[in-house]
Curated annotation (Swiss-Prot):
Protein name: Small ribosomal subunit protein uS2
GO cellular component entries: cytosolic small ribosomal subunit
GO molecular function, one term: structural constituent of ribosome
Organism of origin: Cupriavidus necator (strain ATCC 17699 / DSM 428 / KCTC 22496 / NCIMB 10442 / H16 / Stanier 337) (Ralstonia eutropha)
HAMAP family: Ribosomal_uS2_B (MF_00291_B)
Lineage: Bacteria, Pseudomonadati, Pseudomonadota, Betaproteobacteria, Burkholderiales
Coiled coil location: none
A Pfam family assignment: Ribosomal_S2
Gene Ontology BP terms: translation
NCBIfam families for the chain: rpsB_bact
Keywords, ordered alphabetically: Ribonucleoprotein, Ribosomal protein
Record-stated family: Belongs to the universal ribosomal protein uS2 family.
Keyword Signal: no
């Protein structure tokens, strides 16, 4: 589903930060200012957003994994929801240092969480004392909160999508270090450096955040659907091209 300029305006994607907090590297994407607030040029944002979505579609069509990152209060819920809809991993609580660069260690925690889930399913809590069961539940809850969204990721993702690149600087740095492409919403108070697909826009409004996140989830689902369609058409095409030659 394509996003329009009107939708971006209605979601407030054009509202940047206070002019005194600006990052000069965002100057090419700033239209001007009103009441000491920078206004982002949506004529720049829209094509850049479309370009990012094109990349997302291609990646999804090739069965790539995109990790959604958004741990701020206004993005947590919608991010987890939309990543789930797209069948992608996500980080909606604190970013743990080394989540990408030290994935081996993270894998150990994922295994622990999965083992605990399996044990609970098998009725292990019933054999524990009240105190043991409480400790078990507490640990499991803590693990679920920090790594529940990435427990099925399997390895380093093919790309990461970040809402508010300044707030998630560690995630961006880790992705850059590993050469993992970054799709990022960049507000007027942050730098677009290190972001492969820059989406200049408001990263604080829950309406704006919902628009970006839904857009990425839609692009993933479209990419997958297109890939399936191509396989079906290729199979059909193969049937059409086969012509039996009569002998004699």
């Amino acid at each position: 589903m394509s996003v329009t300029m009107r939708e971006m305006l209605e979601a407030g994607c054009h509202f940047g930060h206070q002019t005194r907090f600006w990052n000069p590297k965002m100057a090419p994407f700033i239209f001007g200012h009103r009441n000491k607030i920078h206004i982002i040029n949506l004529e720049k944002t829209l094509p850049m957003f479309q370009d990012a979505m094109k990349y997302v579609r291609q990646l999804a069509a090739n069965r790539g994994t995109i990790l959604f990152v958004g741990t701020k209060r206004q993005s947590r819920e919608i991010l987890a929801e939309e990543a789930g809809r797209a069948g992608m991993p996500y980080v909606d609580a604190r970013w743990l240092g080394g989540m990408l660069t030290n994935f081996k260690t993270v894998k150990t925690s994922i295994k622990r969480l999965k083992d605990m889930e399996a044990a609970k399913e098998a009725g292990a809590l019933e054999t524990m004392s009240k105190k043991e069961a409480l400790m078990f539940e507490r640990e499991m809850l803590k693990l679920e909160k920090s790594i529940g969204g990435i427990k099925d990721m399997g390895g380093v993702p093919d790309a990461i999508f970040v809402v508010d690149v300044g707030y998630h600087k560690i995630a961006v740095t880790e992705a850059n270090k590993l050469g993992v492409p970054v799709i990022g919403v960049v507000d007027t108070n942050h730098s677009p450096e290190g972001i492969d697909y820059v989406i200049p826009g408001n990263d604080d409004s829950s309406k704006a955040v919902a628009l970006y996140v839904r857009g990425v989830a839609d692009a993933i689902l479209e990419g997958r659907a297109n890939a399936v369609q191509e396989v079906v058409e290729a199979a059909r095409g193969g049937d059409d091209e086969f012509v039996e030659v009569q002998e004699g």
